[in-house]
Amino acid sequence: MIGRRLAVILATVVLIFCPRGVPAADPTPELVARGKYVFGAAGGCACHTTPDGAGLNAGGTKFDLSFFGVVYTPNITPDAGTGIGKWTDAQVINAIRRGERPDGAKLFPIHPYKYFSNIADDEIEALVAYLRSVKAITSTVPARSLKIPVPARTIVPAVKIAPRDGRARGAYLAGGAGHCAECHTPRRFDASTDDTKFLAGGPGPERSLAANITPHNETGIGRWTEAQIARFLRTGVKPSGHEAYSLMRTVIVGTSAGFKDLTEADALAIARYLKTVPPIDNKVR
């Protein structure tokens, strides 16, 4: 009887102090490595590392959002004073998936939590483990200056375990960590994506132009083979021989990891998925 009561007490303690979705023990090297892969599938979270900044994930990239205001990417290193070092795993996950800081402040949706909310439980836990493994950097970024309230975005509950292969894997990667639609889907006046033109390209962040990546034969990538799409994702080289530039080049190269580190199987899975989305005639350039 005493043994049974002790087991119940211990189980209760675990449930209270180690809630589901938050690792209870020190992460294994395998978990950290998997987290780095997820980090790379997100383009190395390149917005959080400025070329002349303080270092990996130290933040400080400025986004001038016109009439919305100005925001800066935060320091996401494990520094206790200026980064996320004092945040719990659950708080880090909440910021990634829901765009909410521990103090309740909402992140401006230039942080793609609409898509990051799709990252599976097992992979987001690995991602947090990796974020905690990088060098802590003391770097204070400027405060944001918004002219309007932070727009709300729809959050989709994540799956518990990430799909492992096939089109489902490709859809998961493109619609989650890869957040392809964040740049490749045109925006409405309120900065939300116009999903009637899903992946059809147009003006992107930082005055860039995002390509039409629907399988339209004339204005999209309909004439590209799956192998050519996969090669582009990993190398930045188009079938024409031209290379990616601007933001696309940034996410391919990444930081400590990027699209270049995708496995061939995952790159092909994304390619297969892109071949199945509705083709849209939209000439970007």
Q: PLM ranges: what are they?
A:
Residues V22-G40, V150-G176:
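Electrostatic cytochrome c docking/interface patches
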Residues K36-V70, R98-K106, V134-T138, G175-R207, ...:
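Periplasmic/extracellular electron-transfer cofactor-ligation site
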Residues M1-R4:
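N-terminal secretory signal peptides that target proteins for export/translocation
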Residues A7-C18:
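Bacterial N-terminal signal peptides
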Residues G43, K62-N94, K114-I124, A191-K238, ...:
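Electron-transfer interface patches adjacent to heme c in soluble/periplasmic c-type cytochromes
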Residues E30, D89, K106, E123, ...:
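Ligand-binding pocket scaffold of soluble enzyme catalytic domains
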Residues S139-V150:
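Extended, well-folded interaction surfaces typified by the phenylalanyl-tRNA synthetase beta subunit core
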